[in-house]
Amino acid sequence: MSNQRPISAFIEKNYLHFNSAALVDAAKAYKKHIAEGKKMLVSLAGAMSTAELGISFAEMIRQNKVHIISCTGANLEEDIMNLVAHSHYKRIPNYRDLTPEQEWDLLQNHLNRVTDTCIPEEEAFRRLQKHLFKVWKDAEDNGERLFPHEFMFRMINSGDLKQYYEIDPKNSWMIAAAEKNMPMVVPGWEDSTMGNIFASYCITGELKASTMKSGIEYMVWLADWYTKNSGKDGIGFFQIGGGIAGDFPICVVPMLHQDLERDTIPFWSYFCQISDSTTSYGSYSGAVPNEKITWGKLNIDTPKFIVESDATIVAPLMFAYILDL
C-alpha cells in the first residue's frame, strides 16, 4: 500500500465491484474532468454539514477541486453552527429506541434532533442570530440587497464569530468558501432556520423581505455564471443527496437551451450522484441519470455515475481519492 496516498491505495485494492467500483469509477472521472481544466459544481442536500463533511470538503475547496456550490439553507447554516457550538451538540446512538415522551424532553431542553445528533438551539441558532441580524440590518440601512450566502460570508469574514470557534476552522467548509468568495446558489433558502428567523423579522417590521435576494435572482445569476464558465466542454455536476440542492442548478442548462434558445451552451459534462434514495416510481432523487437526458440536462456521452449508498460514508472517501490522500 502506498505510503504517499494510503486511502487511495486502500480504495483501489478493495473497491472492485458493485457500489464500491462505481465509487472508484466516479472518482477517477472527477479527477480526469478537473485535470482537463474543466470546472465542477458540487451540490449538498440532507444534513451533510451536521455530518461534518467540512472535514474533507473544506480541503476540496482550498485545492480548487470544486468551483461552485449549490446547497440547502440548512447546510449553509449548519456548518457554521457546528463551528460555534460543537461542544454543546448531543449524540444519541440509540435514537431508534426513543419514545415520543423522550423526544419531547429533547425539545424542552432545546435540542433539535437530526438522526443521532442533536443541535443545541441556544448555542447554535441564537448565537448566530444576533450576529446575522446585524449583518442583515446594516445592509438594509445601506440600501444593499444580497444573497443568503453573501450575508453568511460577510458575517464569517467580519471575524465576529472567532470568539466562539469550537473546532479547527480548517474543518469548516463555509470558512473555506468565504475565504475564496466561492460562487454559490442556495435554492429554497427560506426553508431553513435562518430563513424562518429572517421571516420573523419581516413580520415584526424590523427587516424588509426585499433585502434578501430571491431564488429567481439566483437562477438569473447562475445562467450568467454557467454561460461565462462552461467554455466548449461544460461544467461537471457532483450531487450529494437529492432534492432542491441538485434539482435547481441542474435545470440551468435546459433553461438556457429551451427558454433562451442559446443552442451553443454545452450540456453538463460530468454527472455523479451519491444517494440512498432507491430508484422508484415518480422519484426525481432516485431517478437514474439517463432520465436526465430526456430533460435536456445531460448529453448522450456525458460520463454518468450513481453510487447508491450513504453519502456520509461515500463522499469523504471520494474526496480523499480526488485529493490523492
Name each model-derived stretch.
Residues 26-40, 176-180, 224-234:
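Glycine-rich phosphate/diphosphate-binding loops that line cofactor/substrate pockets in enzymes
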Residues 1-27, 31-34:
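N-terminal glycine-rich anion-binding loop in soluble enzyme alpha/beta folds
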